[in-house]
Structures are given as structure tokens and as C-alpha cells.
Amino acid sequence: MEELPSTAVGIRLQDGVILGAVRRLSYGGYVLSKSAKKVFPISRFGIGGAGLFGDLQALTRIMNANIKYYELYNNRPISTRAAAKLLSIILYQYKYMPFISEVLFGGVDNGEPQLYVLDPLGSLLDDIYAAVGSGARVAIGVLEAEYSEKLTLTQGRELTIKSLRASAERDVTSGDGIDILTISKDGKINTEFLSS
């Protein structure tokens, strides 16, 4: 499979989870947009990724509806692990016409931050940090060199930004600003945009 355009990064820390992605939207060497948001809050969770932009948007809408349905039907909140497993099942259901996206999914349950990585066919991996997309090789190098479980949420945010900026310098399908989604240990979600 070819590398999917764009770059997204996720980091799990003791204080929370951080997801980040670049804004450039490109296909086949052509830049379609410089303002494509690829990190979204869903209920108490965050989702982000790289690949086909429409597929990532569709997955976000599908997950939003399924999480609401689960919580209404069961009269209790869905856990991060269960929501990630639900996303895995949805991706696998479409294996013959897959969503061409690599997805990062994060949340906090009872003060425990969690980060999951999913491929287009629904493989589900629990990880402490991850990078997906065409700029992942550069971003993961920065993460591996500087990640520590002792990082604060602010330091993790800075590491996310540094890894995405490094990928934007070396990958033509990455760039044009960064979206950051932070979920703190107490469940508060913060989103922000940083220009290039």
C-alpha cells in the first residue's frame, strides 16, 4: 500500500493524550487545500489521522453517531477501549471498500490516558506514541529521540508540534499549519490551531 498523504501524531502521557495533524490536503502532488482539519473531538475522545480526507470525515461522523447510540441505549458512557474497538469493527466491516485512512484515537478513562492506532482494515494497537501518514518516518524519529513518560502535557504538546514541523520540512504532502487536540487527565478537551 502506498503511503497515505499528510501526517498525524499521537502521544500518551501520564497527564493526558495529545493528537496533532498538519492541515495540508493534497492528492497526487496537487495541494487542494491548506486548511483541512484532520483532528476532531468526538464526545469525550479525540480522533485524527492521515489519508483520504473524506474518509476521515466520514469515520468521524460514523463514530460520533455510534458513540451517542451506544450511550443512549446502554445508559452509560462507553470506555475509550470499547470506542476504539468499535472503530476497529467499523473499519473491518468495510474491508472490501476500505476507508483509506490511518487513524489515531485517544481518550481518558478514570484518569487513565489511552492512545490507539488503527490501519485501514481495523488493526487495533495500543501505544504510547505513534505517527501515521507519509511524514510518519520523520515524525517518529523525533518522537523516539525525545519521548519520555515523565513529560508534562505542555512538554508533550511541544514535542507533538516539533515532530509535525519536522515532517512538514521533509514531506511535500505535510504542512500549512498544525491542529492540536489535548485531552487532560480530568477529561477536558482543548483544541488549537498553529500556523506554519
Swiss-Prot record:
Residues 1-6 form a propeptide. InterPro entries: Ntn_hydrolases_N, Pept_T1A_Psome_bsu_arc, Pept_T1A_subB, Proteasome_sua/b, Proteasome_suB-type. Pfam families: Proteasome (PF00227). It is found in: Cytoplasm. GO terms for cellular component: cytoplasm; proteasome core complex, beta-subunit complex. NCBIfam families: arc_protsome_B. This is Proteasome subunit beta 2.
